Amino acid sequence: MVTIKQIAQEVGISSSTVSIVLGGKAAERKISTATQKKIFAAAARLGYQPNMAARSLRGGSGANELVVAMFWAQDFRASMMLRFWDGLRAEIEKTARPVRLVIYPYVNDHLKESEALTSGANCHAAIICNASYADLQFLEDTQLPIPVVLYNRVCNGYCSVNVDDLKMGALAARAFADQGCRTAAVLTSSPVFEGMENRMHGFRLEGEHHGLTILTNRYCENSIRGGYEAVSHRLRHEWKQQLPDAVFCGSSAIAHGALRAFCEAGYIGEKLPRLIAVGNGPEESDAFSVPSLSVVYLPMENMARECIQLVLGQLDGRITTPESRLLPIEYVPRESCGPLTEYAAQ
């Protein structure tokens, strides 16, 4: 195992300075950025990992155990965590070395306050989910002491796993056009990361390309209640005289609320607008709703598997430079909207 003393000898700096930097205390001790970069580069080159053997043994775990932190935002996305967690667990079960997952909830824009991430004293590596613009800026400006993988985000210097968000929106618009829709509304919450904006941008561009008129978007809460209240309000006002032919929802939760509101108002069967959601909720909930919900499916479980693979690859030295993986997405037609044509599906 590589020691702090060996790193100090490699770069010609005192062991105490190396310890401060690797412990995440460089800023408060006013250690220069150049010195920090030298230390982190040497640590990566030599294969240094935080020594948590004693901590693990005190907790009843073996010294060989890897501790991987999962940082997840404390907001509307908390309910989506289970699918991601299931993907992590499925991949970890295939590994020979024991891995312990630890969840660290955090508040968007305040990732920099997570000492477990900046100190490197509590985990060997981290997977960061739901990072905001401010959080990504913090990551870009900071040299962290442990390997980090980003879920559905891109940031210079970090490994990441993503999907094509523009295509997610485009697939929904194409499906509506193929079903003969001429007008479409959007139900989504305020964007908290670039991918949300890209989905709506892709939807608008593809829709306009196919002659689909996109109605003015008004944000709603990203929840079942939010979708229900948004549709109920519109049915009393701008949709009172004329419904849109189609509705694109930014999440499964919003869509389920929307379906409930339409049903209560008597819009069922052929009276119901075509409806597609970004499929980020439990697949069973989408498949067994009434009507069953058509989605552009977000492959969260597969993305989680790729995240843990990147973590383990960095820890064992197989991955030494930032690597980004782009996973495929698909449109899953169900009762709320029909399939793509053969041409559009290509």
Protein language model regions, located:
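N-terminal helix-turn-helix DNA-binding module of bacterial transcription factors
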Residues: 1-59
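Short beta-strand segments enriched in small/hydrophobic residues
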Residues: 15-20, 58-76, 183-190
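Conserved hydrophobic residues forming the short capping helix/wall of the S-adenosyl-L-methionine
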Residues: 43, 92, 207, 235, ...
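Alpha-helical recognition/docking segments in bacterial nutrient-uptake
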Residues: 62-174, 178, 235-239, 253, ...
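Short acidic/polar active-site loop segments enriched in Thr and Asp
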Residues: 66, 124, 182-183, 213, ...
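Hinge/beta->alpha junction and helix N-cap segments in small-molecule ligand-binding domains
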Residues: 73-83, 102-111, 161-171, 187-233, ...
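Flexible loop/turn connectors
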Residues: 236-346
